[in-house]
Amino acid sequence: MVWFYIALVVILILLLICLILAISIHNKYFFNRFVADSLTRYYTKDEFGLSEHVVSFSCNKRKLKGAFYSKNIEYPNNLIIFCHGMWSSRKAYMQDIAYYCQNGFEVFSYDAYGVDESEGNSIVGLGMGLKALDSAINYVKSIDAYKDKNIIVIGHSWGGFCALNIVKYHPNIKKVIALAPFISINQVLKGMLPKKLGFMAYFITIIDFFKCGFYSLENAKKNLKKYNGDAYIIHSLDDNMVNYNLNTGLLKKNLPNYSNILIETVNNKIHNPQYTENAVKLLNEYLAKLHSLDLTKQKELKSQTNFHDLGELDLDKIEKFILK
């Protein structure tokens, strides 16, 4: 009997150590704000001649900043909601937003909680991204001019996770498009952690749950089974940020006979399947050079780099899916 209690104490100590380590890892990545680098020359709305109507809406008792973008609206019954990825803001996706606007759509995009122009002392956790999207859709639906429009949600990476799982909270969304998405927080963490520490993904997800609520536990593998709208997922097999096999590959195995879910794989696009191969190549060369420099020279490189070539788009297939 004594050995039983000794074993129990040892197990509890190990669990406590794992939780403390999980808190430390979670805080390292999410217990801070993200502000867009002022030296990075992103595309701007003015370059594309877009109109911009800036708004704010509530999420977790804070104000998130977003905007409605348009050019020549040809599809007035549709609204695209665009969700940015991790460690970026809507500024980094202005070329994507402009593409849809130039093709006749109105787009609403926003900075997530704790990101750039939005309030929030920190990002809080990955689950907060889904909560922010939930709040954004509720806000849009509260506006008389938009409440009856068909909503199409597009997201990249973290935004892709949000796009796939928001269907649980808003099942009437017409379409969702996910670019290099992770299907759950647990799965993306498994891919990012060293293999021997993969079990820590469960503990970090628990910490995310305590901070963000049930949004942190959502899994597209389950939620897409109940979704009657159309879903399109595009993911590069060589993605080094969101592991394909642990996310989209797993989804493909579990949802093989769902005619409303289209999964497409590409290669040589790494974590940006919406970019041309040349843009991805240039981006990787830039990042490799950037990481080899000290801080002073990094600033010089950023100020001298034309980021437009690094973000050239390849969105023809996505546009066809939206219009079908």
Language model features: what each stretch is:
Residues I123-D144:
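Alpha/beta-hydrolase active-site loop
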Residues M86-Y99:
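The serine-hydrolase catalytic nucleophile loop
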Residues W3-S58, K65-Y69, L287-K302:
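An N-terminal hydrophobic leader/cap segment in hydrolases
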Residues Y227, I233-D239:
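Short beta-strand/loop motif that positions the catalytic acidic residue
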Residues I97-E119:
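Conserved alpha/beta-hydrolase
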